[in-house]
Amino acid sequence: MSHTAEIPLVPGSESPLELKPLKAADPHVVYHRRAHRLLSLAKDSPLADYFELCRRLVSIQAKLAEEADFGQLLAWGKDEATPLSLLGSEADSYWQGLLQQLLSDLLPQVDESIARVVRLLMQQSPEQLSSWGRSLRQGHVSEVPAHFSLFIWAAMGVYWSHWAPMVIKRMDQRKVAQQSMCPVCGCHPVASVIVDQPRAGLRYLHCSLCESEWHYIRAHCTSCGQDKEMTIWSLDDAQAQVRIESCDECHGYTKMMFVEMSPSMDVVADDLATLMLDSELNAKGFGATTLNPLLMAHEIT
């Protein structure tokens, strides 16, 4: 159960063909679909055990997204570029409460090695958790113990994704500029998704925290913005469902998920399932400018 601050909605066009700068997610639906996709992908993956852990975690996220008490929307920067990035320390108690619920639900579902990590995380102080949460949201992954990051981000994701749709309704989307970071919460994208609605071939970046999507013109680097020296890579053919767009100027890259070709795809799960593409690009001297909430393995600046 949750309550929304009394902030007037910003009117928008009703044209079905209008390009939407921002698209809100239904977190319960997103998490449910992600869990199903992880189950499907695990069948042919050498990382089947890890996929199963992630599936259980995401299934708990789906449950919390539907059943948890999120309190009321805290003060947020409605006139700022990334309003949910400005939530104060009051938000910490809410997402930390979700973290304890998530860990309690997960504990009986994991083996003893994971259970030890879960119990240790449950014993951390609120101040320590707040510090780690800030570091993760700022992309400073190395400042947080690697064995805790997955669970902390999962809890924060449930909280931020709950409020993002309501905040988006109250944002003036006419002021949303093309940008590398999420216009709602300020976090990194997971990857690009190529969609066929409202028009075929549109690209959106998918947020790693609040699950929102924002439009970004294709053939432009999603990190530095240049549009002249871009290269497309794929493992099999030019029409692959997952491809990588790399930038010859900043040497960053982002994956592109062609969900128009395969509607069952999930940006987080399918990014995790195509790590061989990352290995190929890393070997060529390129680095990801994105963050996967299920594999927080590198520093992002």
UniProtKB/Swiss-Prot annotation:
Under InterPro entries, the record lists:
FdhE-like_sf, FdhE_C, FdhE_central, FdhE_N, Formate_DH_accessory
Could you cite one Gene Ontology molecular function of this protein?
Answer: ferric iron binding
Entry-linked Gene3D superfamilies = FdhE-like domain
Q: Which CDD domains match?
A: FdhE
Q: Which GO terms describe its cellular component?
A: cytosol
The GO annotation for biological process reads: protein maturation
**Where would you find this protein in the cell?**
Cytoplasm
Q: Which domain of life is it from?
A: Bacteria
- Which Pfam families does its entry note? FdhE_C, FdhE_central, FdhE_N
- Entry keywords, A to Z: Cytoplasm
By sequence similarity, the record places it as follows: Belongs to the FdhE family.
Q: Which HAMAP family match?
A: FdeH (MF_00611)
State what this protein does. Answer: Necessary for formate dehydrogenase activity.
The UniProt entry, under PANTHER family, shows: PROTEIN FDHE (PTHR37689:SF1)
This one is known as Protein FdhE homolog
